[in-house]
Amino acid sequence: MRIVPREKFVDPGFEEFAYEDAPLSIGDGQTISQPFIVALMIEKADLEADDKVLEVGTGSGYASALVSRIARHVYSVERHERLALQARERFERLGYGNIDVRVGDGSKGWAKAAPFDAIIVSAGAPEVPTALKEQLDLGGRLIIPVGRNDEQRLKRITRTGATTFAEEDLGGVLFVPLIGEDAWTAAHPMYTATAPSSRTEETSSKLISAAAEEFSSVDDKSFAVLFDRFADSRIVLLGESTHGTAEFYETRAAISRHFIEHYGFNLIAVEADWPDAAAIDRWLNGQAPGDGQPFRRFPKWMWRNLEFSRFVGWMKKENERRKASHKDPVRFYGLDLYNMSGSIRSVLDYLETISPETAKIARERYGCLSPWQSNPATYGRAVLTEAYRSCEDAVLKQCTELLARSLDDAASGKDDFLNAVQSARLLAAAERYYRVMYYGGAQAWNLRDTYMADTVEHLLDFHGPAAKIIIWAHNSHIGDARYTDMATARDELSLGQLCRQRFDEITSLIGLGTHCGEVIAADDWDGRAEKKQMNPSLPQSCERLCHEAAKPRFLLDLRADEELHASLVEQRLQRFIGVIYRPKTERLSHYMSTSLSRQYDAFIWFDETHALSPLDAPQSSKGDPETFPFGF
């Protein structure tokens, strides 16, 4: 895969997106598969240098090109003439002379060139086509996705005799359909209903409008009462579609206050570093907050902002009231026990002293951690170098030492949750976590969300059966990833998914979204916070449906109306803006396909929103009791 330039097999203008582990459109309803799945299929084909290989579904030609660098000869069949001609031209330009391409029905194989030592099918069939099995040589391997488009399994069929075959299941996958006489017809729903019709969209908007429960302001007492239906849950996850919108913070604060005051919720956990949140928690509970101000690192505006500081001030007063009436306090936690933001800051500072060029690579890679990006728009600047790899051991040592110091501080500060057993567990897994984080990618996301889910579980266990927790995190964390491109295209999971799987009946997932407005975000990781204008949501997106419902603010209960739920099951684009916003590449950088009514239990809508108000850090390095935590 290092030899074949993948960027030569994508459409013009998409070169910078070539190396993200995600599929990319190449036209005619086809995609170039993500590098991981291409590598997996080739690996499972057990290719040898003298093999003759058939690929069904040439597409861009990338897989055939890879196979041609391993095997003696490749035969490739493509249904679309334009793609076949394009692939042939690419092979000629690159000097790959051992590939033959023809236009035809891939489900019938290539009988004249048979038998084959291996056949790789780059499209999903309802069942294994007989013709392909018959064109295998004795001992030949057929790699093919089989099943309906939402339940495909990757199979390896090995010919063991004249009429006998062995079959292995290699796991779940998602491919475009194989069209042909022995496969799907051209009327396959992936082609006929990929984009919802205008009539369907109009119907869905009307259903949203009818089901929408409007509110005038999150400050009205009637607003928080709307969420009483979720108060029986033990875990309530409150999302946001950006990390820089005032209304999202104000909404989560209003719901949290109501649940704390009236329904016994006593834990708040947020998408933040544990040490910073621990300083807030100590201050909320009358303890010395420690040296320094929390949330001083990028992206500091996420928690160092006026809207959140008001909620912190309310929790402080609430705990004072509780102390006076001999009630247990509200506790505040960060879900990132491994101190992700602090660790990244430590990595960048270290790399800056060793090699500024390597530090630039690290910044780009940390900017690509978001799962909704079709590809980091900066791949070329984020490619791994030997210098980057050479810093790995030193970085791991530095991050682990930082974690150990944090745990020591917790012990000296009498942090009852992070006891000796919990600290030992964290340190034992630290090296793996920091190594994965250093290189980024889907594995880093999965590891982080799994640890956050573990933290939620440990908090509930520690605080006892009466404990109830509210979680503040991005929609990409609190939504159920199984019903998004995160799972189908990148094999990623989410905190919301894991909470549902572990605590199904007592978990509520509530997303938040907007059509347009202002947002605080940076251009790149570690960049300057800026007030940016959001583009209006894209046509045929979930957000555009809500916008066309023509109501400025509302709650949408996705469980209450069967017709609404069914209408919003269909996959549509949904926008996700993190700490980085790149409006010029909006579609590729900030949208992915989701099933809204399966992803969340409810959705809170603001048609137009405003940027939150970042607070500048005070000059003093000590926590002043009168101005802590944000010095205003």
Question: How does the language model describe each region?
Answer:
Residues 154-156, 162-171, 329-334, 613:
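Short, well-ordered strand-loop elements centered on a beta-strand within folded domains, enriched
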Residues 2-70, 83-100, 161-183, 187:
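Class I SAM-dependent transferase core
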Residues 46-162:
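Conserved nucleotide-cofactor-binding alpha/beta core module
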Residues 191-632:
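Structured catalytic-domain cores with a bias toward divalent-metal coordination
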